[in-house]
Amino acid sequence: MAGQVVQYGRHRKRRNYARISEVLELPNLIEIQTKSYEWFLREGLIEMFRDISPIEDFTGNLSLEFVDYRLGEPKYDLEESKNRDATYAAPLRVKVRLIIKETGEVKEQEVFMGDFPLMTDTGTFVINGAERVIVSQLVRSPSVYFNEKIDKNGRENYDATIIPNRGAWLEYETDAKDVVYVRIDRTRKLPLTVLLRALGFSSDQEIVDLLGDNEYLRNTLEKDGTENTEQALLEIYERLRPGEPPTVENAKSLLYSRFFDPKRYDLASVGRYKTNKKLHLKHRLFNQKLAEPIVNTETGEIVVEEGTVLDRRKIDEIMDVLESNANSEVFELHGSVIDEPVEIQSIKVYVPNDDEGRTTTVIGNAFPDSEVKCITPADIIASMSYFFNLLSGIGYTDDIDHLGNRRLRSVGELLQNQFRIGLSRMERVVRERMSIQDTESITPQQLINIRPVIASIKEFFGSSQLSQFMDQANPLAELTHKRRLSALGPGGLTRERAQMEVRDVHYSHYGRMCPIETPEGPNIGLINSLSSYARVNEFGFIETPYRKVDLDTHAITDQIDYLTADEEDSYVVAQANSKLDENGRFMDDEVVCRFRGNNTVMAKEKMDYMDVSPKQVVSAATACIPFLENDDSNRALMGANMQRQAVPLMNPEAPFVGTGMEHVAARDSGAAITAKHRGRVEHVESNEILVRRLVEENGVEHEGELDRYPLAKFKRSNSGTCYNQRPIVAVGDVVEYNEILADGPSMELGEMALGRNVVVGFMTWDGYNYEDAVIMSERLVKDDVYTSIHIEEYESEVRDTKLGPEEITRDIPNVSESALKNLDDRGIVYIGAEVKDGDILVGKVTPKGVTELTAEERLLHAIFGEKAREVRDTLLRVPHGAGGIVLDVKVFNREEGDDTLSPGVNQLVRVYIVQKRKIHVGDKMCGRHGNKGVISKIVPEEDMPYLPDGRPIDIMLNPLGVPSRMNIGQVLELHLGMAAKNLGIHVASPVFDGANDDDVWSTIEEAGMARDGKTVLYDGRTGEPFDNRISVGVMYMLKLAHMVDDKLHARSTGPYSLVTQQPLGGKAQFGGQRFGEMEVWALEAYGAAYTLQEILTYKSDDTVGRVKTYEAIVKGENISRPSVPESFRVLMKELQSLGLDVKVMDEQDNEIEMTDVDDDDVVERKVDLQQNDAPETQKEVTD
C-alpha cells in the first residue's frame, strides 16, 4: 500500500500519498488581515499623531500636540451590530495637550475622535450591518528606478525616476544630442546641472570634480545657461512657478518644500530602505575594476588595491568597510537650499570594455539613517551618478513587474493613509480656529473639529474600491477574499491602462502570488491571490520561506529563512522534490534549481536554499485541487475560481479524494468556530458550546474560566445562502487551541465540503450531454443530494410623508380577506407562513393627496374628522420566484429607541423568506478541474445505466470534454475516488506531490477493481450492456451559484420606460425580451407583416393601442388597428429640438396635428378612419 495515514482534525483520517515530509506548518491563512490591523492599532495610529504634532498657529504662540490614545468599549457587540445595521466600532479617545507659549500654560484634555471600526477575529469589518473585507493593494514601491528605452532612431537611452510615497517626482532623461535633463514633478525639463548648482555645487569645475568627466556631462554643461547657485535657483523657480516674480529666497523655500520638508515629501521607511539598497556601492561595484584603492577613512589603511576586480566574495569581505563609509567625502554647500554638509562615498572604476582606459566615478549616498524619510542631497547626487554610470555600462535597469519593486498596502496602511487625509484636513481647521479664539479661555476641545476625520474613515469603509462586500458564498470564497491582492484602486492601475506585462506571470511570483488563481476577463492578472506559505514583511514586500543549505556540508538544515523577491535573486534555490539522503544531503550530483527566473541544472555544491513544500507556489484555493499537476493551467484557473462559487448544500460531504488542504482552509476561513484556548467541553447544544479553560501552572493543570461560543443558526449570508453552524465536539472532549468546535456552512467534520461525491460515468446518452451538458439521476433530486437552502431578506420602511405618516395595518382598501390570511393583528406576516409569489408580507398604507373636496364631502369630513381622507396601499409583496417559508420577522421602531433607523423612517420591518432549492434542469454543475456544464436532463433512476452489481450511476459526462481541454486530473480523481469508496477510506493527494499513476492503479487493484478502471455498464431502459466498457468512478461535483431559478424569467404585462414607453429589460425590472434589429430582419424576410406590426406597436410602445387591445380581448371583439407608436413622437420631438420644423401629412397632404393631440383624440380619429374604410394614414416627415 502506497501512502501513509494522516489525521486531519479530530474526526478525519486520510491516506496521504505525499512523498515529501512537511517541514513547515501552514501559517494562519488570514494573518495578512489581522496582523496588519494589529500593527495599525499598535503603531500606525501613534505614528500618524506623531507626524502631525505639533500643530502651531501662524504666530507660533499656540501649540497643539497629540499625546496618546485609547479605544473604548464598542457600543454594540458583533451580533447586535449585524442585527441593527450598525457599524461594529469602538470610540477613539485622544489625549491632547495645548501649550500657550506666552504664559507657559499647559492644558490637557481627552478628546473624542469618532467611532473607529474594529476588525472581527475573522479578519472582516461590520459596516452598517454588512460584513466587508479590505483587500490588500499591490502598488509600485517608492524607490529610485532606472529604465532602458529605445528612441525612434534605434539608440539605447535611459531614464530614471525617484518615486516617493507622497511628494514630487524627480526624473532624469537623455535626448538625441546626449544632453541629460531633469524634470521636477512632471514639469518642463531642465539641464541636469541646473539642479546640481541649486544644491550648492556652483561652478562647472565643482560639478566635474564631483561626478567625474564624461561627454554627457560636458554636453549638459554646454546646454546649461546658469553660472552659479543663485541663477540656478531662479531658473528652477521660473519653471515651477511661471509668471511669478522670482527671488532667491522664494526659490529656496519652494525647492525646500518640494523635496526636503517632511510634511510635503515622504519616502516612508520602505522608500528609504529601497533607495539605500539601490544606491549602495555593494551592488554597483560588483564585477568592476577599481581605478583607485579603497581606503578605510577611520584608519587610513588601504583595504583593496587599485586594479582589483571585485567579485561577490571580495565585496562580502570588505562589506564592513563600505558600511563604515570608505572613501567618503564631505562637501560644505554655500547658498544652497540646505545648509548642512553633504556626505557621499565615491570610488573611481574603469569603464567596462573601454580600450582607452577611461574611468567613471561611482557615488553612493553614504547610507542615510532609516529615520530620514525625506530625500537628501546625497541621494540626488548618488542617483545622478548611477544614471551616468548606466550610460557608461555600469549598473542595472529595473524590472517594474518584479515583486521586489511592488509592495502590498494591507488594511493597516490603507487605513493609516485615509486617517492621514482626515487629520490633515482637521489640521487646517485647527490653525484657523487658533487665530480666531481667545487665548485665555481656549481648550483643545474647542480647537478640534472631528468631522473631517470621521468623514474620511466613513468614506474609506463605505465607498473605497478596496473596501468590498465580503464574498460569503462558501468558506473558501470567504478565505480567498481576505487573501486577495488587487493592483486596482486609488494610487494603483486601471483596467484600461494595464499592459500585458503587468498582468503576466513573473518569475518573482514564485511562492508569493499564485500563478493560477486570477479572474477571467478584464481583471485577469490585476487581481491575484497570496500563495499558501507567503507572508508580508514590515515594508510590505511578500516573503516566501526556504530551507537553508549549509555552505560547508551542503546539507539541508532545519533553519527556515523568509526571502523577499529581490533577496532571492542572489541565491540558487533547489526544488522541493529534490532527492535527499537521511543526512539531508542531495543524492544527485546535478540538481534541478532556479536562479533569477531560469530553471537550470547545477552542481549540488552551488545550492543556497531549497523549497519548503511543493504547494508553496499556489494559493489556498488552487491547493484544494487534487492532481493539479495533470491539469492544463487555464482549466486549473477555472477550477480554482469555480470552487468559490459552490453553493453550500443541505447535506455537505467532504471529498473522498482531497489534498489535505481542506482542513486548514476550513479552520482559517472564519466560517468555523475554533477554540480560543485549550480546555474541556462542558456543555454542547445546537446554538452554544461552553468550554472550561485548562491552564497549566508550575507543571500542574487546573481549571480556569468558562469560554462561551455562540453558534450562528440559519442566518442569511452576504450572498443569500444559509449560514448555519453545527457542533462537532461532545461533552468531556479536551480541545486544543485553534481546534474546530463547530462546522460552518459547506463543512463536514472539520473539513471543507463544497459538494458531494457522486458516481460518474464518461459516456454519451442520446446526445443529451452535447456541449458539456450533464445528465443526472433523479435520485440526486429525491434524496436531496444537491439541495441547498437560500434565505432572502425583504424590507419595508414606514416613513413620514408630506400628507401624513404611513402606517402598517391589516385594514387595507380593496383587498380581500383571503389575501390577508398570513398577516397577524399588526398587519405583518407571521413566522412559519408559507408564502407564494405576490402574497402580502407587510400591509402598509400611505395617505393619498387630498383633491378639492365637494361640499358634501366637506360636510362628511367636518362630522367624521380624518376618516374621509383617502389612503392607497403600498404593500410589501413577495417578488416573482421568491416564495417560500417565512423564517424570521424583525421590527425596528423609532419610539422604542432604535437610533439606527435613517431620518424620516418611523418603523422598519424585515422579513426573511427561506427556500429549499432542489437541483433542476438548467442548474450549473462543475468538478474541481474546470469541467463545468449545465444539467440538460434528469433521468428516472430506473432508466440510468447501471453497474454489474445493479447500482445505477448518478451522473453521465461527455468524454469529449476531456482530451481537448487537457484536464486529465479529473480522470485520475475518478479512478482513485472509486477505489477510495470501495475501500471505505478518504485519501489526500497534495498538489505536485500527490499520487502518481502507479499509486492510482495499485489502489484500484487493492480495491478489487479492473486495473484500467473501466467496467461494463448496462442500459437501464433495455437491460442490454453498452458496446464498450466505460470509465466509471467517483468524482467530487459541486453545484454552482448560477441557478436557473435566479435566471429564468417570463413577462406578461409589466412596467414600461417613461420616455419611450417600451417595456423595460431584465429580470430585476420584470422586463420583456428585446426584439432587436436582426429579429426584425428575420420577420421581414418571412414577410410576416402582421406579426411584425403587432410586435412593433401593441407589444411595444403604442400606448393607446395597448389599452384598446386589452379592452378588445376582454370584450371578445376584433382588435383595432394600431395607432402612432410613442417612439415616433419621441423622434419628432428630437428633430424639433434640433430646430427642424417637422410635420406629419396624410395622403391628401393635409397636416395631421401631432403636438397637442390627446391620446383619446388619436383613438377617435383612428376609429373614424377605420369606419370610413379610408386607406391607412401614411406618415411622412417633411422639412
Swiss-Prot record:
Domain of life: Bacteria
Similarity section: Belongs to the RNA polymerase beta chain family.
Biological process terms in GO annotation: DNA-templated transcription
Recorded catalytic activity of this chain's protein: RNA(n) + a ribonucleoside 5'-triphosphate = RNA(n+1) + diphosphate
Listed GO MF terms: DNA binding; DNA-directed RNA polymerase activity; ribonucleoside binding
Keyword Transcription: yes
Keyword tags: DNA-directed RNA polymerase, Nucleotidyltransferase, Transcription, Transferase
Lineage of source species: Bacteria, Bacillati, Bacillota, Bacilli, Bacillales
EC number: 2.7.7.6
Role of this protein: DNA-dependent RNA polymerase catalyzes the transcription of DNA into RNA using the four ribonucleoside triphosphates as substrates.
Protein name per the record: DNA-directed RNA polymerase subunit beta
Assembly notes: The RNAP catalytic core consists of 2 alpha, 1 beta, 1 beta' and 1 omega subunit. When a sigma factor is associated with the core the holoenzyme is formed, which can initiate transcription.
Biological source species: Staphylococcus aureus (strain COL)
GO cellular component: DNA-directed RNA polymerase complex
